[in-house]
């Protein structure tokens, strides 16, 4: 049986909720949204369909995703434009589209369906493939370099911090031992090294034993959390007053950054005991979601990748007194 095209296999997560949250901000004459993680263009396609006067600027660091999404969205003509960059360069993307402020920014974080499904990219532990994991194939650092050239101490730190794996010391030691004879070149070789380090009793408790190691390596290779820490404040600063920022994350490290940045903007900055809250002390953001919203049971059944999604959204309330900062 012939496999469906990649764009047809991708099902956007929490799509209806994203559109409903964006809708109040798009009630303007010529609204513009930045899709900061374009991927296969699923969310953008739905936005352009639902809001006929909307323009969307899609951002992605993955040239393959930009090419596929561009073909899929070609029929929308000048209502869609794409830019090859990382999503911390949101202001530059807006400027390239000819706007200073936008009405909404959407983040669908983490690894994309395209990257997981394309075996040769090396993101998935379930396929044997070259150790790569680069979201941008033109980037220099790959998982091969990290696995084979980083010291045991550095590997341990990455797997513990980015993978939140308590067996990080054992896994790092096993990787260094395995590469002593010859470099680890494939995902299967890496999986074997991880399996040898994780106790048998623990291998069946939290899914695949290599899941957290692969997450850690992917984050390291693509500097995902560093980029995200810059991107959320940049997004808040790029939306107009009344504009909205929506972020979907897929693991606790991403969600923690989003939560903290949104909470910081939603707090008063008035000094404790200050008798009057001055305008410059008032919150910049209003949180629109109660905690992190999750996909319902039906969506999770239809789209298993939605199971780990956590959605948070904010609205910008006022201008900031210090340019370039929403805090």
UniProtKB/Swiss-Prot annotation:
Location within or outside the cell: Cytoplasm
A biological-process GO annotation: rRNA base methylation
Record-listed E.C. numbers: 2.1.1.199
Keywords per UniProt: Cytoplasm, Methyltransferase, rRNA processing, S-adenosyl-L-methionine, Transferase
The reaction(s) this protein catalyses: cytidine(1402) in 16S rRNA + S-adenosyl-L-methionine = N(4)-methylcytidine(1402) in 16S rRNA + S-adenosyl-L-homocysteine + H(+)
Family that this chain belongs to: Belongs to the methyltransferase superfamily. RsmH family.
Designated name of the protein: Ribosomal RNA small subunit methyltransferase H
Naturally occurring in which organism (per UniProt): Kocuria rhizophila (strain ATCC 9341 / DSM 348 / NBRC 103217 / DC2201)
């Amino acid at each position: 049986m012939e496999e469906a095209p990649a764009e047809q296999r991708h099902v956007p997560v929490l799509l209806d909720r994203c559109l409903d949250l964006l809708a109040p901000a798009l009630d303007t004459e010529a609204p513009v949204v930045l899709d900061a993680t374009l991927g296969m263009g699923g969310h953008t396609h739905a936005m352009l369909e639902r809001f006929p006067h909307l323009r969307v600027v899609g951002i992605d660091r993955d040239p393959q995703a930009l090419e596929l999404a561009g073909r899929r969205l070609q029929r929308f003509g000048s209502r869609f434009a794409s830019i090859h960059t990382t999503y911390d360069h949101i202001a530059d993307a807006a400027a390239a589209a000819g706007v200073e402020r936008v009405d909404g920014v959407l983040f669908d974080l983490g690894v994309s369906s395209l990257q997981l499904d394309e075996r040769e990219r090396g993101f998935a532990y379930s396929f044997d493939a070259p150790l790569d994991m680069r979201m941008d194939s033109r980037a220099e650092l790959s998982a091969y370099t990290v696995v084979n050239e980083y010291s045991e101490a550095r590997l341990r730190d990455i797997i513990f911090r980015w993978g939140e794996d308590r067996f990080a010391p054992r896994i790092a030691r096993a990787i260094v031992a395995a590469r002593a004879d010859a470099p680890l070149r494939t995902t299967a070789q890496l999986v074997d090294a991880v399996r040898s380090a994780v106790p048998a009793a623990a291998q069946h408790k939290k899914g695949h034993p290599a899941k957290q190691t692969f997450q850690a390596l992917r984050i390291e290779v693509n500097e995902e959390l560093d980029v995200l820490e810059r991107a959320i404040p940049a997004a808040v600063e790029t939306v107009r007053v009344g504009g909205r920022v929506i972020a979907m994350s897929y693991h606790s490290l991403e969600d923690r950054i989003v939560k903290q940045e949104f909470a910081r903007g939603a707090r008063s900055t008035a000094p404790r005991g200050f008798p009057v809250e001055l305008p410059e002390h008032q919150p910049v953001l209003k949180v629109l979601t109660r905690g992190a919203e999750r996909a319902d049971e039906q969506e999770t059944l239809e789209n298993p990748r939605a199971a780990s999604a956590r959605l948070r959204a904010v609205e910008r309330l006022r201008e900031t007194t210090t340019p370039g900062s929403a805090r």
